[in-house]
Amino acid sequence: MVTIRADEISNIIRERIEQYNREVKIVNTGTVLQVGDGIARIHGLDEVMAGELVEFEEGTIGIALNLESNNVGVVLMGDGLLIQEGSSVKATGRIAQIPVSEAYLGRVVNALAKPIDGRGEISASEFRLIESAAPGIISRRSVYEPLQTGLIAIDSMIPIGRGQRELIIGDRQTGKTAVATDTILNQQGQNVICVYVAIGQKASSVAQVVTTLQERGAMEYTIVVAETADSPATLQYLAPYTGASLAEYFMYRERHTLIIYDDLSKQAQAYRQMSLLLRRPPGREAYPGDVFYLHSRLLERAAKLSSSLGEGSMTALPIVETQSGDVSAYIPTNVISITDGQIFLSADLFNSGIRPAINVGISVSRVGSAAQIKAMKQVAGKLKLELAQFAELEAFAQFASDLDKATQNQLARGQRLRELLKQSQSAPLTVEEQIMTIYTGTNGYLDSLEVGQVRKFLVELRTYLKTNKPQFQEIISSTKTFTEEAEALLKEAIQEQMKRFILQEQA
């Protein structure tokens, strides 16, 4: 018979008591009532915060958007096909955030900042909230440095400054993405970090943009955030905020950044889909009441920081697609009212061969000449005036049969000026080349040429000036002014090249 030793038992009990951990872990959980169409309704989760991440039993992550009296409306960041009614959900206690670091440069990521280019993981030790507050009034300073796009029509007449928000608006297939990608290409060597956010686009279109950037060496300073048309609405809605967080990381490190949202119409549609499925009351065009806030809180994050914060900047170029040129629709009017100006691309101009198809008459920059170097101001003023007069005369000339000589000359000059604004895609020009081009046109040097010869002459003149008069470029880049010396060099080059060009054409 085994004897029971009381002291042994008491020792074991004491040891167990000493090892007992009284830590109580409270987990905020709930149960799935209903799931479908990228939305789940959860019973429970009493302590959940608005915008908090929740985790489902099978691993899917969602965001709590609707906090109602008897249930929580959650949008899913995935297809949610494995989520079952009655399965458990737990709150994570975290708001959506992404890792950020220099290692993101040159990579293609999704809305959760996970790489999708097949080049392995991205190392990052820091995190930023996807939705962070925009800089306040004291944290900002007025925009004063130019951000060159490389497009004559924009840099001369609708200038963009670092820290500005300039809307690119137009119908489908009018070259909106081309304007944005040309701007990225033109930042080479300018120490500007670019972020391109593709929302709800075809995967082939995004691949084409990435290929263009890689071929031109622009991916070295660019991050692409892509959520294609087959992505869940939640991720299409989040993608612009992810892009903004990546750009902010560099902005607060005293760097200059450029972010392109292509396009915000698709983000608004994704948000409308989510809101209607969550049974939020629809407003104008079935968009929810807070669709203005959706875009304003995103675009207000673009800023030029004050001297005390290091003068970093984030320039935003949001793109909005119109239907049949209707800029008075809900989303276009909202974004126009938030931004500091808009570049309007016209389908009629595009189809008539004027590319980039910028309608200079109704495009505007509310920063204006503050975002131009002095040399550009000196030559650009005359260009805008002459083009405006030409547009007026051209409309009038359609009805008038006989025009006086002065009017005919002005129409001829206008046609040549319109010709010099045309540029091939992915061929941005330096400021010096733009100044030379505008000066040549506004001072009548192109009047003696046929309209069809203008572009050929200008291409040859740029090459001639670069090889034979390099001082011209040096003067403008060092002084930022169109000095008398620079003007004399340019006049000389134009006259010499004109003689050569006429001889070539006659031969």
From Swiss-Prot:
<dbReference type="InterPro" id="IPR000194">
    <property type="entry name" value="ATPase_F1/V1/A1_a/bsu_nucl-bd"/>
</dbReference>
<comment type="similarity">
    <text>Belongs to the ATPase alpha/beta chains family.</text>
</comment>
<dbReference type="Pfam" id="PF02874">
    <property type="entry name" value="ATP-synt_ab_N"/>
</dbReference>
<keyword id="KW-0066">ATP synthesis</keyword>
<protein>
    <recommendedName>
        <fullName>ATP synthase subunit alpha, chloroplastic</fullName>
        <ecNumber>7.1.2.2</ecNumber>
    </recommendedName>
</protein>
<comment type="function">
    <text>Produces ATP from ADP in the presence of a proton gradient across the membrane. The alpha chain is a regulatory subunit.</text>
</comment>
<keyword id="KW-0547">Nucleotide-binding</keyword>
<dbReference type="InterPro" id="IPR027417">
    <property type="entry name" value="P-loop_NTPase"/>
</dbReference>
<feature type="binding site">
    <location>
        <begin position="170"/>
        <end position="177"/>
    </location>
    <ligand>
        <name>ATP</name>
    </ligand>
</feature>
<dbReference type="InterPro" id="IPR036121">
    <property type="entry name" value="ATPase_F1/V1/A1_a/bsu_N_sf"/>
</dbReference>
<dbReference type="GO" id="GO:0043531">
    <property type="term" value="F:ADP binding"/>
</dbReference>
<dbReference type="InterPro" id="IPR038376">
    <property type="entry name" value="ATP_synth_asu_C_sf"/>
</dbReference>
<feature type="site" description="Required for activity">
    <location>
        <position position="363"/>
    </location>
</feature>
<comment type="subunit">
    <text>F-type ATPases have 2 components, CF(1) - the catalytic core - and CF(0) - the membrane proton channel. CF(1) has five subunits: alpha(3), beta(3), gamma(1), delta(1), epsilon(1). CF(0) has four main subunits: a, b, b' and c.</text>
</comment>
<dbReference type="InterPro" id="IPR020003">
    <property type="entry name" value="ATPase_a/bsu_AS"/>
</dbReference>
<dbReference type="GO" id="GO:0009535">
    <property type="term" value="C:chloroplast thylakoid membrane"/>
</dbReference>
<dbReference type="InterPro" id="IPR033732">
    <property type="entry name" value="ATP_synth_F1_a_nt-bd_dom"/>
</dbReference>
<keyword id="KW-0472">Membrane</keyword>
<keyword id="KW-1278">Translocase</keyword>
<dbReference type="GO" id="GO:0005524">
    <property type="term" value="F:ATP binding"/>
</dbReference>
<keyword id="KW-0934">Plastid</keyword>
<dbReference type="InterPro" id="IPR005294">
    <property type="entry name" value="ATP_synth_F1_asu"/>
</dbReference>
<dbReference type="Pfam" id="PF00306">
    <property type="entry name" value="ATP-synt_ab_C"/>
</dbReference>
<keyword id="KW-0150">Chloroplast</keyword>
<keyword id="KW-0375">Hydrogen ion transport</keyword>
<keyword id="KW-0067">ATP-binding</keyword>
<keyword id="KW-0139">CF(1)</keyword>
<keyword id="KW-0793">Thylakoid</keyword>
<dbReference type="GO" id="GO:0045259">
    <property type="term" value="C:proton-transporting ATP synthase complex"/>
</dbReference>
<keyword id="KW-0406">Ion transport</keyword>
<dbReference type="GO" id="GO:0046933">
    <property type="term" value="F:proton-transporting ATP synthase activity, rotational mechanism"/>
</dbReference>
<dbReference type="InterPro" id="IPR000793">
    <property type="entry name" value="ATP_synth_asu_C"/>
</dbReference>
<keyword id="KW-0813">Transport</keyword>
<dbReference type="InterPro" id="IPR023366">
    <property type="entry name" value="ATP_synth_asu-like_sf"/>
</dbReference>
<dbReference type="Pfam" id="PF00006">
    <property type="entry name" value="ATP-synt_ab"/>
</dbReference>
<dbReference type="InterPro" id="IPR004100">
    <property type="entry name" value="ATPase_F1/V1/A1_a/bsu_N"/>
</dbReference>
